[in-house]
Amino acid sequence: METNQILETIRMIEEEKLDIRTITMGISLLDCMDGDGEVARKKIYQKIVTKARNLVAVGEAIESEFGIPIINKRISVTPIAIIAGSSADTDYVEFAKTLDAAAKEVGVNFIGGYSALVQKGYTKGDEILIRSIPQALAQTERVCSSVNVGSTRTGINMDAVRQMGEVIKETADLTADTQGLGCAKLVVFANAVEDNPFMAGAFHGVGEADCVINVGVSGPGVVKRAIEKVKGEPFDIVAETVKQTAFKITRMGQLVGQVASEKLGVPFGIVDLSLAPTPAIGDSVAHILEEMGLEMVGTHGTTAALALLNDAVKKGGVMACGHVGGLSGAFIPVSEDAGMIEAVQQGALNLEKLEAMTAICSVGLDMIAVPGDTTAETLAAMIADEAAIGVINNKTTAVRVIPASGTKVGDMVEFGGLLGTAPVMPVNGKSSVDFIARGGRIPAPIHSFKN
């Protein structure tokens, strides 16, 4: 390796905030199912603390050995609706508490997988789990929840969409003392993936190995600095620059994943190529788009800039790593991105523009605060719109929205840490009540029939 490449890597880490956002251990709980809920919970706790006992220590050892910051160590598990569904329990909050206790015991930041997959319909376990989400998130610290309400193959389960509007509303009310923090740990998906290392949407799919390591990289600051060097150049050059930068970022992710996998004796799964921002200055996806020539993110041209960024990151990342997966795109969470927050405050960025950007990026309406009096039906309709974009375009989309109790447009909602600060954004005041009340399923699109 040439000296200038070594110096470049050091600069990327020290000055441009390059880091590994997360090492996530996926753990299958299929062998923990039991007709007795208490027995199942004991098995779950035992398996998690056994498998993940050294996860944090290994992460810290890799940090000091390679000098690469690893921000989060996390766990994802098999959707609890599947595991708890075999028990006779009529409420699953105790399962959430078990996950929380296991996460605290091994020292991870978050544990994901308090989840249900209801894109086509409900099982008994799904019904109980979804009903228990508000209490589960109110009574735990580190548990994250997700529900998949649609897929390109099956269409959109509008009964689930309607219920999730109510669940989000109830979760916000139950966690009102922390400005609706519970909602920041709840994601509603269409086309959810089984190997996502990022929270709050991570769960360990049933098609996955017993235990696996997935890595999420992050480097918005590095990409912005690279684009600064090609100011005024045509888009071909910009795309090539982003591609080469993404290659370097992903190589580091692969290295960390492989080393962690060897040290833990667990198979290496995937690197997720998503560019994930933080509230820190110089770690913003919005600022990358602005560096391409936009006065402020949200103006005309924003969606095109995001398309170029997302595609170039994937092209560079795929070349750098044998197995990529997860969500693999750009994240645009409003509260976690200094540039997004500023654009909302200046009136340049609104919900409708964010929805358009969703057609390109990984998640969509992410970490968005809306007024506390937003109705459950309006929240459900927002979910339906996002799910439709995902289902029709055969991609993952999601909603993580916080109707913080007692807030109005222009207020600021403080979550702290990586979750940041969200300005409360206006929603369309016209009603979607009759639309959401219909229920049923929106059929799968015609182009989903590929067999």
From Swiss-Prot:
Q: What Pfam families does the database record attribute to this sequence?
A: DUF711
Where is coiled-coil annotated?
A: none
Concerning its family, UniProt says: Belongs to the UPF0210 family.
Q: How does it assemble?
A: Homodimer.
Q: What is this protein called?
A: UPF0210 protein Lm4b_00560
Native organism is Listeria monocytogenes serotype 4b (strain CLIP80459)
